[in-house]
């Protein structure tokens, strides 16, 4: 569907690439498909835990954290498959954003922890951050200021 929207209407699409529900190999197949379809903008997310789980559990050898998925995308961009072999075609030009939480992620002990992980995501290559739904604008503006103070200089 994303390819149809992008190619027919010339609208840039940003598919969500999740840790949840996918193994590393399945993620690689998705990246290959997106590369073939010339879709290069991604939103990289861990995804939610299953309703019956008390903690997030990855699929098979899938990832626990979005930053691990970022590493796979970064390697893919360099022409390296998940098994370590090199692509015989041109490497991918994926760019991506990540999630952030102005009102604190439900699993985080505090907002400082969320800022720490956001900074790690930025250091790993995130170009922008998209907030999860929030209800208090004041907390959003405080979060943006705290992010800037922590050296996080991407659009939020």
Question: What do the PLM-derived regions correspond to, one by one?
Answer:
Residues 13-25, 95-113:
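Active-site mouth loops of central-metabolism enzymes
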Residues 34, 121, 125:
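Conserved, mostly hydrophobic/aromatic
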Residues 1-14, 94, 109, 117:
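Flavin-dependent oxidoreductase catalytic cores
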Residues 31-49:
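Hydrophobic or amphipathic alpha-helical targeting/insertion segments
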Residues 13-17, 42-44, 96-100, 122, ...:
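Hydrophobic faces of well-ordered beta-strands that scaffold small-molecule active sites
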Residues 1-4, 23-29, 49-72, 76-88, ...:
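Active-site-adjacent beta->alpha loops and helix N-cap segments on the catalytic face
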């Amino acid at each position: 569907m994303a390819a149809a929207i992008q190619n027919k209407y010339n609208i840039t699409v940003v598919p969500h690439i999740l840790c949840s529900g996918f193994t590393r190999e399945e993620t690689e197949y998705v990246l290959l498909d997106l590369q073939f379809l010339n879709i290069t903008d991604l939103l990289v997310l861990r995804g939610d835990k299953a309703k019956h789980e008390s903690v997030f559990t990855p699929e098979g050898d899938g990832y626990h954290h979005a930053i691990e998925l970022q590493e796979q995308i970064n390697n893919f961009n360099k022409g390296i498959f998940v098994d370590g072999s090199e692509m015989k075609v041109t490497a991918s030009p994926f760019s991506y954003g990540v999630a952030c939480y102005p009102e604190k992620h439900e699993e985080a002990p505090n907002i400082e922890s969320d800022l720490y992980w956001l900074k790690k995501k930025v250091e790993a290559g995130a170009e922008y951050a998209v907030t999860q739904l929030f209800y208090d604008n004041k907390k959003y503006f405080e979060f943006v200021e705290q992010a800037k103070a922590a050296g996080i200089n991407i659009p939020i």
